[in-house]
């Protein structure tokens, strides 16, 4: 069963902004509205449907969590939950070994603070990201300065294994050879991964492209192929100093032949199989610490449960847009936060080959230049 959230907007034309109280009302992304056409909730709030997946719960709070999980799996990862056996383990050692072999760099550079203490094993204790690590005397520590205040403690750089398979459950994670992402707004690039055969080649190609440019980044890829295919099978994180590497990621990924499939509903299409999103910024209770896809799924789930409390099957487009705005989400482009800057490919010039015209900017807010140029 499919019912429209709002009247369909003709293809190629952005929805018009209604005026409310003298100010333009927030406009809900056309792509998100279409993705939510197959989502509804029973007026009693105990049953909801996301395409072919049915969700049941005994309370509004339980429905918010259950519906958010299904929205995440169906609309973000592209997998769905219907008739799917749960994954028994998040890790597959043989597959992780293939990913480790495909990783082009063995080490990363990490910054830490030398505490001046020794561990029980006699190792120097270095504090890295709030964790205390025992470092043998044979390891080289390069002092770069001292901490502020008091006597100050040495700030050091040290080489560590690039792979950190236990940091993000379900993913094999590495930091770049030149270091990982630092502070500032964090950009996520999602790459659709087809299967176990495609994953190592994609992983190697993208990371090699970044390493050849000495980009600081963090990347992760599904560590158990049973969870494939999925839209976010591989994720690359770029800080402000690395945003100009977006093209390198896209070109390397597309060269491997990414699989076709509907893009994640909440992310911004960059190219076929590649989408982007900013790290969520929502300090409300229950919304902090969520991944991008989880956060957007919870925003939508809350809006649908609120509609059921009014004995309706779905929220209006205006209510969904208001729910996005309350969560610091740009309703017109839900991959952005309301306080996000422009997409990097709008601010970092893309050099065109000599003699080739520079392509015009896209007409719609939902699609990046790369996506427009690659769409028939």
What are these regions (language model features)?
Residues 230, 239-359:
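Polybasic, proline/glycine-rich intrinsically disordered low-complexity segments
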Residues 190, 199-268:
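A contiguous, surface-oriented mixed alpha/beta subdomain in the mid-to-C-terminal portion of proteins
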Residues 159-161, 177-179, 222-226, 262, ...:
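Short, flexible coil/linker segments at or flanking structured domains
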Residues 17, 52, 183, 187, ...:
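Generic alpha-helix detector with strongest preference for long hydrophobic helices that associate
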Residues 2-193, 308-367, 371-376:
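Charge-rich, low-complexity segments
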């Amino acid at each position: 069963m499919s019912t429209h959230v709002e009247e369909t907007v003709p293809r190629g034309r952005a929805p018009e902004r209604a005026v409310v109280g003298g100010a333009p009302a927030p406009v809900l992304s056309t792509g998100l509205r279409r993705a939510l056409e197959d989502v509804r909730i029973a007026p009693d709030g105990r049953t909801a449907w996301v395409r072919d997946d049915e969700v049941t719960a005994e309370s509004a709070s339980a429905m918010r969590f259950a519906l958010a999980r299904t929205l995440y799996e169906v609309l973000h990862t592209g997998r769905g939950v219907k008739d799917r056996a749960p994954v028994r383990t998040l890790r597959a050692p043989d597959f992780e070994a293939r990913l480790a072999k495909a990783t082009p760099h063995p080490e990363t550079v990490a910054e830490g603070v030398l505490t001046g203490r020794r561990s029980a094993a006699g190792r120097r204790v270095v504090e890295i990201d709030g964790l205390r690590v025992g470092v043998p005397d044979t390891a080289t520590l390069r002092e770069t300065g001292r901490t502020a205040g008091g006597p100050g403690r040495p700030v050091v750089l040290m080489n560590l294994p690039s792979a950190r398979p236990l940091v993000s459950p379900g993913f094999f994670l590495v930091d770049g050879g030149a270091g990982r992402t630092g502070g500032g707004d964090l950009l996520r690039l999602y790459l659709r991964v087809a299967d176990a055969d495609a994953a190592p080649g994609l992983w190697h190609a993208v990371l090699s492209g970044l390493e050849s440019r000495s980009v600081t980044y963090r990347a992760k890829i599904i560590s158990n192929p049973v969870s494939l295919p999925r839209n976010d099978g591989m994720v690359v994180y770029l800080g402000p100093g690395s945003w100009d590497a977006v093209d390198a990621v896209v070109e390397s990924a597309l060269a491997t032949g990414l699989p076709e499939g509907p893009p994640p509903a909440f992310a911004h299409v960059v190219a076929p199989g590649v989408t982007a999103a900013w790290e969520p910024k929502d300090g409300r209770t229950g919304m902090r610490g969520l991944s991008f896809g989880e956060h957007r799924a919870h925003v939508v789930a809350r809006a649908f449960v609120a509609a059921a409390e009014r004995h309706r099957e779905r929220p209006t487009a205006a209510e969904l847009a208001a729910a996005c705005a309350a969560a610091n989400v740009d309703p017109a482009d839900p991959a952005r936060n309301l306080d996000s800057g422009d997409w990097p490919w709008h601010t970092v010039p893309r050099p065109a080959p000599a003699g080739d015209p520079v392509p015009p900017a896209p007409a719609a807010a939902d699609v990046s230049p790369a996506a427009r140029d690659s769409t028939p």
